[in-house]
Curated annotation (Swiss-Prot):
Cellular-component GO terms for this entry: autophagosome; cytoplasm; cytosol; phagophore assembly site; phagophore assembly site membrane
Keyword field contains Transferase: yes
Biased segments, Acidic residues type: 313-324, 440-452
Identification of the protein by name: Probable serine/threonine-protein kinase DDB_G0271538
Basic and acidic residues: bias regions: 1-10
Domain of life: Eukaryota
InterPro entries associated with the record: Actin_reg-Ser/Thr_kinase (IPR050940), Kinase-like_dom_sf (IPR011009), Prot_kinase_dom (IPR000719), Protein_kinase_ATP_BS (IPR017441), Ser-Thr/Tyr_kinase_cat_dom (IPR001245)
Nucleotide-binding keyword on record: yes
EC number: 2.7.11.1
Chemical reaction(s) catalysed: L-seryl-[protein] + ATP = O-phospho-L-seryl-[protein] + ADP + H(+); L-threonyl-[protein] + ATP = O-phospho-L-threonyl-[protein] + ADP + H(+)
SUPFAM superfamilies: Protein kinase-like (PK-like)
Length: 527
């Protein structure tokens, strides 16, 4: 099937010759593929296992929309041309592409394990050792450090786009897949970038349609780290970002929800990557060097987060004490007996049980945390001076660079000047609806890969951060974000006739015309 779209109109592509462009869709013969079972499905199509000259491969069959929609064709062409030029142990290996009966297919190496989302869900986040969590985090950061060095911006980093390959007994390797939203980024045309990605991991500047750069991948990586630390369910429900807080991550709440056995430096890294200001986020080069230091040390020697002070959520007026063992045990008993469970407990029972297991085992015999110590790991922020050791406060005093917010400790005091921005008006029905919607248990496997058809809003980040929520609640248009409905007010009720007369200055409302009596016409016809 011939393609009618012009490749010259597509930006963000690597440079190539005409001969290479013609071979993009015919680098292998479909008849050489022996298709097997389906192993995955997404908004762009389905993925099947196949055999290619005796080697197991994964075949991504793209949707038929690629042939008729120029946007889908653009994403497909970028994925092929970018993926075939990548060579990294933590990036899925590209094999070729072909077209069969009008359907385009991308063939890559086959990874036996599932994605990271399934990996966490099947095992339970508390059953994954901190050694493995930091190892997977290092693999992902290594891949993205390589991508950014090649001027590639990914724009859809999430757990479902990370495959976990079991390479040995208890040994795993993370690999990045699905380059459908990736593009070449030279840092010049930041205002022309399309808004795309998954709503749960998109950075604030991408959500509001502002200009962005490769630091949006760092923010998504920070959200992914919080999933490795707290669990996917906690990030999706209790740490859900909404327009009422300018899509900012509540890092103070995340600190309290994290298990006390989490290495202090690992938690600080996640908070640092989730900095609201893109300029405050680290580069992946810095992240890789820091994680290398952490993974090369014994976990028992690493300081852990420890117990957190009780926390009151200002948005929900709820008291959170994740380190109270008695509360966690009570939640576990209520879970087993199915007695006196509220909607909040129903959402978080599994996560509370996991947290209680970690809280009761601070030292963790399997090596998933060390003794609580007064020292803490300091992450350096100087790119030129890379990580070569972990610095402890009792051995050396580190001077942080100015204007760097380590995990957002000062964010709540500095980034919002209008206190009413976070405080809704009294008896606000929209806020009640927002709380109720956040209490609804959402399906973790819900597909989040839809391509937004339009900008979510024309407002910039500063417009949203410094404006009253009512002013942008009516402006924002979020067809792919489910919290837009919580901000919308109920439709007004129709006015009564007396009210209409009052509004119109005493003019009575127009009466509807009476329908003609068709029965008389029928009788006349009979006569």
């Amino acid at each position: 099937m011939n393609i009618n779209f012009s490749k010259d109109d597509i930006t963000g592509l690597p440079k190539s010759t005409k001969e290479e462009d013609e071979n993009d869709f015919s680098s292998l013969d479909y008849s050489d593929l022996f298709m097997d079972v389906e192993i995955g499905r997404g908004s762009f199509g389905q993925v099947q296992k196949a055999s290619y000259f005796g080697t197991d491969v994964a075949v991504k069959q793209l949707s038929t929309l690629v042939s008729i929609d120029p946007d889908y064709f653009k994403f497909m062409l970028r994925e092929i041309k970018i993926l075939k030029g990548m060579r990294h142990p933590n990036i899925v290996q590209y094999i070729g592409a072909c077209c069969h009966e009008g359907r385009y297919m991308i063939v890559t190496e086959y990874i036996k394990g599932g994605d990271l989302h399934q990996f966490i869900k099947a095992r339970g986040v508390s059953n994954i050792s901190w050694t493995l969590r930091m190892k997977l985090a290092l693999d992902i950061a290594s891949a993205f450090s390589y991508l950014h060095s090649k001027k590639v911006i990914f724009r859809d980093l999430k757990a479902k786009n990370i495959l976990v390959d079991e390479i040995g007994d208890g040994l795993y390797r993370a690999k990045v897949i699905d380059f459908g939203f990736a593009r070449i980024f030279d840092g010049k045309d930041t205002n022309n970038l399309t808004i795309c990605g998954s709503e749960n991991t998109m950075s604030p500047e991408v959500i509001v349609g502002s200009s962005y750069n490769d630091s949006c991948d760092v923010y998504s990586y920070g959200v992914l780290l919080l999933e490795l630390i707290c669990g996917s369910r906690v990030v999706k429900t209790q740490l859900k970002r909404t327009p009422m807080n300018a899509f900012d991550m509540n890092l103070e709440k995340a600190e309290h929800l994290a298990p006390e056995s989490c290495p202090r430096a690992f938690m600080d890294l996640a908070k640092w990557c989730c900095s609201y200001n893109p300029k405050d986020r680290p580069t992946f080069k810095i992240v890789v060097e820091g994680l290398k230091v952490l993974t090369n040390q014994q976990l028992k020697d690493l300081p852990v987060k420890g117990k957190s002070k009780p926390y009151i959520d200002p948005d929900e007026d709820s008291f959170i004490d994740p380190n109270d063992d008695s509360n966690n045990n009570n939640n576990s008993e209520n879970n087993n007996n199915n007695n006196d469970n509220s909607n909040e407990n129903n959402e978080n029972n599994n996560e509370n049980n996991n947290n209680s297991n970690e809280n009761n085992n601070k030292k963790n015999k399997n090596g998933s945390g060390g003794d609580i110590s007064g020292s803490s790991v300091i992450i350096k922020t100087d790119e030129e001076e890379s990580f070569n050791s972990v610095v402890y406060k009792e051995h050396a005093v580190a001077q942080p660079l100015p204007n760097i917010d380590y995990g957002g400790q000062n964010k709540r005091q500095n980034n919002i000047f209008n206190p009413s921005f976070f405080t809704p008006p009294p008896n606000s029905k929209s806020m009640m609806d927002l709380k109720q919607s956040s209490a609804v248990d959402e399906d973790e496997d819900e597909d989040e890969d839809d391509v937004p058809s339009e900008l979510l809003t024309s407002l910039t980040v500063n417009d949203i951060r410094y404006s009253n929520p009512k002013s942008f609640a009516a402006t924002i248009s979020t067809p792919n974000l489910n919290y837009a409905t919580a901000l919308d007010q109920d439709p007004p009720k129709p006015l009564s006739q007396s009210a209409c007369a009052t509004v119109l200055g005493g003019i009575p409302p127009m009466q509807p015309k009476k329908k003609p009596n068709n029965k008389n016409k029928k009788k006349k016809k009979k006569l």
